[in-house]
Curated annotation (Swiss-Prot):
This is Cytochrome c-type protein NapC. Pfam families: Cytochrom_NNT. It is a single-pass membrane protein. Keywords: Cell inner membrane, Cell membrane, Electron transport, Heme, Iron, Membrane, Metal-binding, Transmembrane, Transmembrane helix, Transport. Heme 2 binds at residues 92, 95-96, 194. Heme 4 binds at residues 185, 188-189. It comes from Paracoccus pantotrophus. Heme 3 binds at residues 152, 155-156. It comes from the Bacteria. One of its GO terms (cellular component) is plasma membrane. PROSITE patterns: MULTIHEME_CYTC. SUPFAM superfamilies: Multiheme cytochromes.
Length: 237
């Protein structure tokens, strides 16, 4: 039994020594060593933190959950933001995560609610997702409205637009609302990468054009499909 007591005393002695060192490091270690050690630990921590942060900013990470992979990602694939003649693709974080560091951290903190939803299966089935689609869309519309569609403008600049290459009504709308600052991208361009929810009662960002006045307003009567039909007719004019 004596060797057990000796082992315990030896372990306890090392624990108390370590505690004295970390509680009063300057009494045991030089200032230079502490400074260098603190710098190295800081670099390791910062590098690890940013590496983990960037891993969560990838399309692979976003679609690792079946809720995103089987719903919104499938809707993104047929759109021009996923595949186009120039080969420029907008991934999930390009549109849904701010690029500025401070805003990015704030968004990551907000994502804790999404982790909670994952754990408790808030949108674990297609039916649950469809029930929450409008609520989820409204949250994202409000976020983009608040930051003046910052993620859109990371790629699209009003000053770089060639109005001569746009459809007939687009330059008028952009000049009237976008260039003047009266509206922002998300006011008009909802549902560009994912299917729209039921849009009944949700006003569009644009005004009814004079040539359509007196006709049925698509966004008040037919939901998402009617809005898509209306946009299709606009593109052909």
């Amino acid at each position: 039994m004596g060797w057990i007591r000796a082992s315990i005393r030896w372990i306890w002695g090392r624990v108390t020594w370590f505690w004295r060192v970390i509680s009063r490091p300057s009494s045991f270690l030089s200032i230079g060593f502490l400074t260098l050690g603190g710098f190295i630990c800081g670099v390791i921590f910062w590098g690890g933190f940013n590496t983990a942060l960037e891993i969560t900013n990838t399309e692979k990470f976003c679609t690792s959950c079946h809720e995103m992979r089987d719903n919104v990602y499938q809707e993104l694939m047929p759109t021009v933001h996923f595949s186009n003649r120039s080969g420029v693709r907008a991934s999930c974080p390009d549109c849904h995560v701010p690029h500025e560091w401070t805003d990015k951290i704030a968004r990551k903190m907000q994502a804790s609610k999404e982790v909670w939803g994952k754990i408790f299966g808030t949108i674990s089935t297609r039916e649950k997702f469809l029930e929450k689609r409008l609520e989820l869309a409204k949250h994202e519309w409000a976020r983009l409205k608040a930051n003046d569609s910052l993620e859109c403008r990371n790629c699209h600049a009003a000053v770089a637009m060639d109005f001569t290459k746009q459809t007939r009504r687009a330059p008028q709308i952009h000049e009237r609302y976008l260039i003047s600052g009266e509206k922002t991208c998300i006011d008009c361009h909802k549902g560009i990468a994912h299917q729209l929810p039921d849009m009944t009662g949700i006003e569009p960002g644009w005004l009814e054009p004079p040539e359509l006045r007196g006709e049925e307003q698509a966004w008040l009567g037919g939901g998402a499909e009617a809005v898509h039909r209306y946009l299709a007719t606009v593109e052909t004019r």
